[in-house]
Every structure is written in structure tokens, then in C-alpha cells.
Amino acid sequence: MNLERLYKVLLGPVISEKSAVVADKGNQVVFKVVKTATKPEIKAAVEKLFNVNVRDVRVLNVKGKTKRTRFGLGQRSDWKKAYVRLEQGQEIDFAIAE
């Protein structure tokens, strides 16, 4: 795969209560990814950027919320979330990640 594409696939980690519970319980990390990203691209990007072995990837599309603005109703953008399960004994520490 194109190296430039792999660097653009991951937009950042998702920091929430649910992602913290999943990280502790199932050795998983949650990322916000580009809407056009595929599972093999996400797996390759995580393995390349963080030097870990990925067991599997699950993705879901998050629908944007409808919010009120001073101009009426507005819509937040839809986005894609990826749950990445790492091999046993592997972990990603975002504080020291390159």
C-alpha cells in the first residue's frame, strides 16, 4: 500500500469512557479514521506507525448529530470509528508514540 495513504488513514485516538473500558478489558484501541478507509488499510497503518501486531479490526460509521444553531437546525459530519484489537502482550502508549 502507498505509504502516504497509510499516514493519512488514522485521524487520531477516540478518548471516551467506553474506549477506556474497552482498552482495559479487551486489549483494544479506538481510532477515528478516514471515511474511505478499509480494514486492511487500518491494520497496515497501525502496524506501521506504532510497531505492534494487530489481531483484528472492527469498524463502524458514526452518524452526525443534529444540532440547533442560530440559523436553525444543523448537522454534524458523519465519521468512521475503528476498534483495533492488538495481539496479546502488545500495547500502544500515546504519550511516547512517535
Swiss-Prot record:
Gene3D superfamilies: 3.30.70.330. Keywords: Ribonucleoprotein, Ribosomal protein, RNA-binding, rRNA-binding. One of its GO terms (cellular component) is ribosome. One of the early assembly proteins it binds 23S rRNA. One of the proteins that surrounds the polypeptide exit tunnel on the outside of the ribosome. Forms the main docking site for trigger factor binding to the ribosome. GO terms for molecular function: rRNA binding; structural constituent of ribosome. One of its GO terms (biological process) is translation. This is Large ribosomal subunit protein uL23. It comes from Saccharophagus degradans (strain 2-40 / ATCC 43961 / DSM 17024). It holds the Pfam family Ribosomal_L23.
